[in-house]
Design a protein with these regions (language model features):
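Active-site-proximal specificity loops/subdomain of glycosyltransferases
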Residues: 38-83, 90-93
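N-proximal low-complexity "stem/linker" segments adjacent to membrane-targeting elements
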Residues: 1-23
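A structural signal for isolated positions on well-ordered beta-strands in alpha/beta enzyme cores
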Residues: 4-6, 30-31, 49
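Catalytic-site signature of metal-activated, phosphate-bearing donor transferases
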Residues: 61-69, 91-235
């Protein structure tokens, strides 16, 4: 089974940690688009396949969705996961890798072409200014938005970066085997989830507030940092 993970990112400081995390989850193929920054891949990545491209993105909201569709048309993988640099795939302890999860999912659900994976939104652990490692973030709240692991050959178009529209008779399921038709699905994250480091530090939130273009669908405000953090609890 060939599974890739696709990333469009503006954030060089996240990339090494993001790569290491997903290699640990079983990913061996990466499709990475670096928006206006250089990155030197070290020798530790010589055993994984990284398709890497430097790009300068236009100031257009649709750019990300159009890029995702091009990736689906160009690359022949069984599945591709489309996530961002502040998002990290997580699995419960019963699964050794993403491959293991999909194989066991197939034993329960035979008719699917993608899996919608809910967000867990993590706050900054009350350490406002310091950016910590991924594993140190433990407080979160459940969010109904999803990101998608999908068979690229079945994708018709992306109208939203969270969920593609598939060809006729193709289906995306959540972890419980329920069909997903919108980018928001009642939260379920017992076996698989996206660890979304939404308010990782105050400094990084300031950058999110200032962003415009493909990565910004709506205006953010500084006070939202504290609003989101206050929703995060130990679960």
């Amino acid at each position: 089974m060939e599974i890739a993970i696709c990333l469009l990112t503006t954030e060089p400081n996240h990339l090494e940690e993001w790569l290491d995390h997903h290699i640990n989850k079983g990913f061996k193929d990466f499709i990475i688009f670096r928006d206006r920054f250089d990155f030197l891949y070290g020798e530790k990545y010589q055993n994984v396949n990284i398709i890497d491209e430097y790009i300068e993105t236009p100031n257009e909201v649709r750019f990300q969705m159009d890029l995702y569709l091009k990736v689906c048309k160009k690359h022949k993988y069984d599945y591709i996961l489309f996530i961002d640099s502040d998002e990290y795939l997580e699995l419960s302890e019963e699964y050794s890798s993403i491959q293991d999860f999909i194989e066991k999912f197939k034993e329960k659900h035979s008719n699917f072409d993608g899996i919608g994976i809910n967000w867990r939104m993590y706050g900054n652990n009350d350490i406002i200014k310091t950016r910590n490692s991924v594993d140190s973030y433990i407080k979160y709240y459940r969010d109904d938005h999803i990101k998608t692991l999908v068979d690229p050959s079945k994708v018709k178009i992306f109208m939203d970066p969270h969920l593609p529209i598939l060809n006729n008779k193709s289906h995306i399921l959540n972890e419980k085997g329920e069909k997903i038709t919108t980018p928001i699905k009642t939260h379920s994250s017992n076996s698989i989830w996206i660890k979304h480091l939404w308010t990782r530090s105050l400094e990084e939130w300031k950058i999110k507030v200032q962003r415009r273009g493909w990565y910004q669908f709506y205006d953010r405000k500084m006070e939202q940092f504290y609003e989101y953090n206050n929703k995060c609890i130990d679960i």
